[in-house]
Amino acid sequence: MQFMTNGFLRGLTMAGALFLGLGRASLSTAETPGAGPAADARGTIDQPLQQKIEALAAVHKGRVTLYATQLNTGKTVSLDADRPVQTASVIKLAILFEAMEQVRAGKARWDEKLTLAKGDGVSGSGVLTFFDTPLTLTLKDVLTMMVIVSDNTATNLGIDRFGVSAVNARIAWLGLKDTHLYKKIGKPATEPMPADQPKFGLGKTTAHEMETVMERIGRCQLAGPGESAEPGDEAICRTALTMLRNQFYRNTIPRYLEKLDSSETGSGIASKTGSLNAVRNDVAIIAGKSGPMIVSIFTDENEDKSWTADNEAEMMIARLAKEIVETWSPAGLDGKALVPGLGLDAGSSSGASK
């Protein structure tokens, strides 16, 4: 996983080069096939596409949960989108969002200094654990490492800076009921753990709730209820999007959608992955020529636990993303549109109700 050593080895390899049937992909009652396009609180179900993704997910040897929406049209598709799942490293999006809000409030600065001390390093994905200590880094450097190479040591530095309780308070502020950060990675818990922590590990979420977090980042919606956008919001969101569009792990959602790698500019995809042995996840903002999309896909109980490039769950995520994006944006991607706000009005389509 990006969260454990074998995933890290996979990441280094990449760096060197730069349900068991339909019943397991169960549908919510709002997603009954054959009923024609239907409206729910989140948008309008794209019924033909819904049937295609159901068929794709039905052959996967594991479980798939998914929520995707095209923001300018309100079209949606989903599979079991409200079932709580293991986040693995996708929970790092919530840490990033809390950092953005604290920078906005003047309680943190991108250029503030954090110190990596002896004993801070943890195993798993990332490279900071191999650096000599003490080492001084900026907050921006730490969060960049947390996002683009899913650095676990950097993640813990971020958690130390903001606190587990602050991240969870922010999650509650967003109105999310089934998303939670439990603890630092590879370190003992410093507070009593909820009863469900052993089941979920580092964090839990749903495909729909993590779509909400990524959509807030893409739309640059940092203001709370009754608050107005501030002049500095765009710069904060641009910094976060730069991290996310330079994502190093690109074998899942980006796999069939573009040929750019993380060393090249202009990617139309900003994403965060998360992996454990039997878990593979990816959540992305995708700047399509026909309009921006958020695609949130989680897989668990996967039979294929390998760390090879053709891992079945990673291939499944890639195929689902390809089907969604090529249906909603047949002309392809537009990297120039991956900017704060995504070219949308502040209250347009699905985001206004979240």
Label each PLM-derived region with a short phrase.
Residues 63, 135, 156-222, 227, ...:
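Mid-domain, small-residue-enriched loop/turn segments at the edges of structured enzyme/sensor domains
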Residues 74, 86-114, 295:
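Active-site SXXK
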Residues 48-81, 293-297:
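A short, well-structured edge-of-sheet supersecondary motif
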Residues 32-56, 161-163, 213-257, 261-268, ...:
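Structured C-terminal helix/loop/strand segments within mature extracytoplasmic catalytic/sensor domains
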Residues 2-13:
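Bacterial N-terminal signal peptides that target proteins for export
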Residues 71-72, 110-127, 162-163, 184-189, ...:
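Acidic helix-start/capping segments at beta-turn-to-alpha-helix junctions
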Residues 119-156, 164, 203:
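Conserved catalytic neighborhood of penicillin-recognizing serine enzymes
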Residues 11-24:
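Bacterial N-terminal signal peptides
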